[in-house]
Amino acid sequence: MNALSKVRVYELSKELGISSKDLISLLKDEFSIEVKNHMSVVEEEDALLIKEFYGESKEENTEENIEEKYGDLQEAQIKVVKKNRKNKVKKNDDENDAQEEIVIEMEDTITVKELSDRLKKTYAEVIKELMMMGVMAAVNQEIDFEAAEKLGEKFEAIVVQREVDVLEESVEQYIEEEEEEGTVKRPPVVTVMGHVDHGKTSLLDAIRKEEVAASEAGGITQHIGAYTITINGEKITFLDTPGHEAFTSMRARGAQITDIVILVVAADDGIMPQTEEAINHCKAANVPMVVAINKMDRAGANPDKVKQQLAEKGLVAEDWGGDTITVPVSAHTKEGIDTLLEMVLLTAEMQELKSNPNRKAKGTVVDAKLDKGRGPVASLIVQNGTLNSGDSIIVGTTYGRIRAMFDDKGRKINSAGPSIPAEILGLSEVPSAGDRFYVVKDEKTAREMAEKRKEKTRSEYLATSKVSLEDLYSQIKEGKIKELNIIVKADVQGTIEAIRQSLEKLSTDEVKVRVIHGGVGAITETDVILANASSAVIIGFNVRPDSNAIVSAEKENVEIKTYRVIYSAIEDIKKAMIGMLEPEYKEVIQGRAEVRMTYKISNVGTVAGCYVQSGKITRNSGVRIIRDGIVIFESELSSLKRFKDDAKEVAAGYECGIMVEKFNDIKEGDTIEAYTMETIKKHTL
């Protein structure tokens, strides 16, 4: 080998047959060689010396003995930290007499303002310290427990996390100190983040390989929000979260349950706004990153440019002398995928991820939805303990007893251990994505806890004058409105919180945008009643109002806006607030028809035998297919017939045959809604 060549710590540990952690301790204690992590390099001369030393003393320095000798260092550090935390709470009486310590109890997050007040420090002092820690937060923004704890140490205060503050006597089992001997190694939970179109989904698909191919071949893809793969006999759990800037809250939520982030950056595009946003989330949550420089098969690929941009953001690549792992990959050719996963496992090894599978389970909701046949369905990640079928659980403000449990491939299972995703049935309502869940002793306890939580979180809605987006700006200027209330309905629960935060970010000094309710499914009369009582605008994403809701909204003068894309709603509200809403087209619903029978004609497609319930269906109208209150397809009519003759229009009370352009999956019971876009006079507010 070349005299100047170097070897990485993890490669050397493989040769010696010991873990990277133990080798780092060995280097420090026996050779006084300081290395940062498993990706650091040592000189070839030193590596040969270590091999020689290890070879000579192999009998007395077996892996077990080395672990006994050096592995205890980490355990001792953990014990010291835990002991120190206990000692902070239980100081000697003499010390307490000398100085009274501040003890602050908090939940998962706390605002900078509240923490400043409880620390008895000015906002400026606290914000300055946060900036020194690399956390950028304004007075009213929330910070997590880890940041608050570090801040407490700076100001000589003790910050204690209170996991569950409702019926604490029922859940105190969850905040007991973990038994050290009860913990075992668990799989890492990984989130893939990156800018839109940088190949995040392609990379996930390449990692899943045959699992994806097998599920898609049958026409069914499990939307569980997480899945587990096995590589070299070790499991890795991936969170499948959206990659757009609007889904900030989802990624922030993911960072709370994520152990490692794979940051995808296109080699030909470099760092973009969503990439920078993802980097900031990881830094704030102190989650280690492995950077996947994707699209290396492209002609314009420039990994050095990406590394330069990463360095500008404080992430210096390990081959540039830093400690950020970068792996060139191609989701298209599969190049570098195995190396990437190996780096993930090595990073996980350095983190020493452990949990106790023998306790009652707790974890987080990844996604949830309302299934017509199965009722409320929740996808969970178990973070500690083992979740069993038949367990009684509380999830946010809902509760239930697990009737059935499925893995990420849709197979029925009886239990799920730490870091394993599972889909469960048996909850009373659809929970929110990001809700924490806990197993309790029985369903009665879970119900009581859920009811108490509902009482605590129930908001009071004040009835004021009606509001619409078109006249919002004038009402703001006249001082008639200080708050814009919005009700959000969507087809999947996982997007509700992301939509909520995106809309609430639009708040200004003159008007506060507030999402007062979010739910899954069609817009109902109940939503209209709530909107009427609280002067709210109803916004639907990929869902439609039912007939009762339409009648009630017209009667009560409640505005219902429906969208397919979140950004359209944000832009409309933005324009309304600054007086620039200029609608050019207005959607006019022409009629609705119920599908009563379907006919498949070879080489032609599916014909729907329909009965027109209201209005009329015209040949040139746009149509949307609605199934169980959710829009599943939008297109145009390719054929409209009355008996065997072509028809220009069919009125209410008559039957007709309909074919929809590029859509053959029409089913009995579907509703076909016909509409036209009418040009209206431009209106400046």
From Swiss-Prot:
Location of the region described as G5 in the Swiss-Prot/TrEMBL record: 330-332
G4: annotated span: 294-297
Superkingdom: Bacteria
Localization of this protein: Cytoplasm
Record region (G2): 219-223
Assigned keywords, A-Z: Cytoplasm, GTP-binding, Initiation factor, Nucleotide-binding, Protein biosynthesis
Residues noted as binding GTP in the record, renumbered to the chain: 194-201, 240-244, 294-297
Gene Ontology terms: cellular component: cytosol
Annotated spans, G3: 240-243
GO MF annotation: an example: translation initiation factor activity
Pfam family, one: IF-2
Domain tr-type G, chain residue ranges per copy: 185-354
PROSITE patterns xrefs: G_TR_2, IF2
Region (G1): 194-201
Record's keyword annotation contains GTP-binding: yes
Known function: One of the essential components for the initiation of protein synthesis. Protects formylmethionyl-tRNA from spontaneous hydrolysis and promotes its binding to the 30S ribosomal subunits. Also involved in the hydrolysis of GTP during the formation of the 70S ribosomal complex.
Sequence similarity: Belongs to the TRAFAC class translation factor GTPase superfamily. Classic translation factor GTPase family. IF-2 subfamily.
Record protein name field: Translation initiation factor IF-2
